[in-house]
Every structure is written in structure tokens, then in C-alpha cells.
């Protein structure tokens, strides 16, 4: 991901304030509600029958935290995302058969959740930087599909 020094420091500065468990659960929950076809990858998560069931689901929250823990790792290796996410890309491609488009969708949902949590602090410039990051992560996760 090609970020200026200013963009990198803005991204990492904001990320230091992110409550990974809260934001991760909300982002994954919103993905499952807004794009219901993504629920097919989470059959073992129990009740996903309504928006409130999804958003209150402990397994959704736990997996959302796990996803953002990996994202946090990626933020420390912005210049080598493909290597950082190689194993996860392989897992999602070969074993889980996740449509790689879902990574892009989740990245965009994450940006929405960050905007919701940080309000005016999440400036258009910061959004632009985060869009670059989530696009880079989505591309890295889709790498093994090609």
C-alpha cells in the first residue's frame, strides 16, 4: 500500500484509539446484515436470523475481534501485506472457499464503522488513507485466488 508519511501516521494514530473488540464485532455484524449472502460462511455461529440477532451474537463479536487483530498486524506491515496475509489468504481460498469480493465489502464496512465511531475526527483525508489500506488488505487476502 502506497501511503505518504502523513497518511501512515494518521492511520496508525487513529488505530491506536480503536477498540478492536467493539469495532470488529460491529464491522463483521454489519457485513452479515447488509450483505446477507455472506452469512453462509458462518453457519456454525448460531442465530443470524435478524439484525439484532447478528449484532448481539457472541461468535460474531469474537470473530470480528479476531479479524481486526489480523488487520492490526497488517497495519504494522503495510509494505508487505501479501506476505503478512499469505496464510490467511490460503485458508480463506483453499479451505473456506470465501468469495474474495467479501474482503473488499468488509473493508468498506470497516471504514463506515470507523466513521461512525470517530465522527469529525475521521476526516475525508483519513477516510481516503483507510480506503487505500482496506483495499490493500483485500487484495492481499485475495492473492492466493489468482
From Swiss-Prot:
Pfam families: Globin (PF00042). The modification Phosphoserine is found at residue 44. The modification S-nitrosocysteine is found at residue 93. GO terms for biological process: hydrogen peroxide catabolic process. Heme b binds at residues 63, 92. The modification Phosphothreonine is found at residue 12. Residues 2-146 form the Globin domain. Red blood cells. It comes from the Eukaryota. One of its GO terms (molecular function) is oxygen binding. Keywords: Acetylation, Heme, Iron, Metal-binding, Oxygen transport, Phosphoprotein, S-nitrosylation, Transport. The modification N6-acetyllysine is found at residues 59, 82, 144. GO terms for cellular component: blood microparticle; haptoglobin-hemoglobin complex; hemoglobin complex. The modification N-acetylvaline is found at residue 1. Belongs to the globin family. Involved in oxygen transport from the lung to the various peripheral tissues. Heterotetramer of two alpha chains and two beta chains. This is Hemoglobin subunit beta.
Amino acid at each position: 500500500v502506497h501511503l505518504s508519511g502523513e497518511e501512515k501516521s494518521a492511520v496508525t494514530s487513529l488505530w491506536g484509539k480503536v477498540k478492536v473488540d467493539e469495532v470488529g464485532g460491529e464491522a463483521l455484524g454489519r457485513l452479515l446484515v447488509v450483505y446477507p449472502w455472506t452469512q453462509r460462511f458462518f453457519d456454525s455461529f448460531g442465530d443470524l436470523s435478524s439484525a439484532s440477532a447478528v449484532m448481539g451474537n457472541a461468535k460474531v463479536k469474537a470473530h470480528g475481534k479476531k479479524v481486526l487483530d489480523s488487520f492490526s498486524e497488517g497495519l504494522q506491515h503495510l509494505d508487505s501485506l501479501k506476505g503478512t496475509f499469505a496464510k490467511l489468504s490460503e485458508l480463506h481460498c483453499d479451505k473456506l472457499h470465501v468469495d474474495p469480493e467479501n474482503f473488499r465489502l468488509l473493508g468498506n464496512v470497516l471504514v463506515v464503522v470507523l466513521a461512525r465511531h470517530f465522527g469529525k475526527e475521521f476526516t475525508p483525508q483519513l477516510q481516503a488513507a483507510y480506503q487505500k489500506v482496506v483495499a490493500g488488505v483485500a487484495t492481499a487476502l485475495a492473492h492466493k485466488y489468482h
